[in-house]
Amino acid sequence: MAWSQSARKPMIGLLFRAQQHSARGYSYSAFQAHLSSSNVDQSATLLRRFSSEVPASEQMNLIKQLRERTSAPIKDVKASLVSCNWDIDVAQKDLRKRGVVLAAKKSSRTAAEGLLAIAQDEKRAAVVELNCETDFVARNDVFQYLASSLAKLALSARDPGELVFPFGPDYLENLNVNLDHPKLSGETTVQSAVTEVAAMVGENVKFRRGFIMSTTAHGVVCSYMHTCPQPGLGRLAGLITLEAEDSNAPLDALQRVGKSIAMHIVATKPLFLSKELVSASAVENERDILRTQAESSGKSQMAMEKMVEGRLRKYFEEVVLLEQKYVVNDSTNIKSVLNDLSKEVGSKVTVGNFARMEVGEGVSKA
C-alpha cells in the first residue's frame, strides 16, 4: 500500500538518527520523546500529502457544492472537507455537528433583528417572530423559509379556542415541522430546526413569540405587512378583525376596508380600541401631566381646565383607534370609516380585535 511504503523511509531515517543520539549519550526517555514528536510530524505530512492528491479544481468544486448544501461559512466548509479527506457527505455531517456546538455557544447573544411571518385563512391568522442578530441574516432565504414555515405550523396547530391567543416559544418548539427546502428538509422539531438554521447562518437565531387572531362566522381577518422582502414576511404587522351583524353582508367589502385599517394600525400605533377601554388610571395619569403643564401658563383655573380637556381629547386621538385620524384621509377618523362601511354593506360593522407587532420591540440591544 502506498501509505506503508511512503512511511518506511522516514522510519529508517529516524532509527539511524536515534543510534547517533544514543552514541552521544542521549537518555532513553529523550530518545522516546524525539521519536514521538517525529512520528507526529510525519503523520501530519502524510495527511497533507493525501489531501493534496485531490486536484485544486476538484477541491474548489467540492467547497462550492458543500457551501450550497449547507450555507455554512467558506472557511468552515473547507476545514470540514480537509479534516474529512474531501469526502463531501462525511464533511456535511461534520459541519452539522460543529454548527450545533457553535449555535449553543452563541445562544446568549442578543438577537433583536429578524422577521415577522404571517399565515392566514378566511377566519384566522397566525403571526410569528423569528429573531437573528443582523438584518443581513434576515435576508437569508433559509431564515425566511423557516419563518414562513413556523407561521404555517402555528396556523395549522390545534385551535386555541380564543379570539386572540398570544404564545411564546414553548407553544411550538416541541412540535414537528415538515421542511422542504434545498438546504433544510425533512421532519424535525421546531427547536431543532431553529438550531440548525443558527448553525447555517452563524448567528444566534431565536423563535421569540407569536399570536393567533380569529373572527366570528360573519367576520374577516385583515392584515398588512410592512417592509416585505417577500409576501407574508415583514418587520411590522398590523391585524384587525371586522364583524358584520348581518350574515348576508358582503365580506369582500370588509376585507377591502379592513386591509386599509390594518395599514393604518402599523402607521399610528394605537393602544386602545375605544375611549371606554382606556383604563381610569391611564386617563388620570395623563390628566395630571396635562394639568401640571397648564399650571405653568399662568391662566385662570377655568381656562386651565379647558386646556386640560382639549389636550385630553388630543391624547385620545393619538392612542384610541376609533378616534384616530385616518391615515388615508385625515379629514375623517376610523369611527367614521366604519360608519360609512356599515352603510355600504347594509349592516353594522364593528371591530372585534386588533394588534400591532414589530420586530425586536422590547428587546434590549445593549
Swiss-Prot record:
<dbReference type="GO" id="GO:0003746">
    <property type="term" value="F:translation elongation factor activity"/>
</dbReference>
<dbReference type="Pfam" id="PF00889">
    <property type="entry name" value="EF_TS"/>
</dbReference>
<keyword id="KW-0809">Transit peptide</keyword>
<dbReference type="GO" id="GO:0005739">
    <property type="term" value="C:mitochondrion"/>
</dbReference>
<feature type="transit peptide" description="Mitochondrion">
    <location>
        <begin position="1"/>
        <end position="50"/>
    </location>
</feature>
<dbReference type="InterPro" id="IPR001816">
    <property type="entry name" value="Transl_elong_EFTs/EF1B"/>
</dbReference>
<dbReference type="InterPro" id="IPR018101">
    <property type="entry name" value="Transl_elong_Ts_CS"/>
</dbReference>
<keyword id="KW-0648">Protein biosynthesis</keyword>
<dbReference type="InterPro" id="IPR014039">
    <property type="entry name" value="Transl_elong_EFTs/EF1B_dimer"/>
</dbReference>
<dbReference type="GO" id="GO:0070125">
    <property type="term" value="P:mitochondrial translational elongation"/>
</dbReference>
<dbReference type="InterPro" id="IPR036402">
    <property type="entry name" value="EF-Ts_dimer_sf"/>
</dbReference>
<comment type="similarity">
    <text>Belongs to the EF-Ts family.</text>
</comment>
<protein>
    <recommendedName>
        <fullName>Elongation factor Ts, mitochondrial</fullName>
    </recommendedName>
</protein>
<keyword id="KW-0251">Elongation factor</keyword>
<keyword id="KW-0496">Mitochondrion</keyword>
<comment type="function">
    <text>Associates with the EF-Tu.GDP complex and induces the exchange of GDP to GTP. It remains bound to the aminoacyl-tRNA.EF-Tu.GTP complex up to the GTP hydrolysis stage on the ribosome.</text>
</comment>
<dbReference type="InterPro" id="IPR009060">
    <property type="entry name" value="UBA-like_sf"/>
</dbReference>
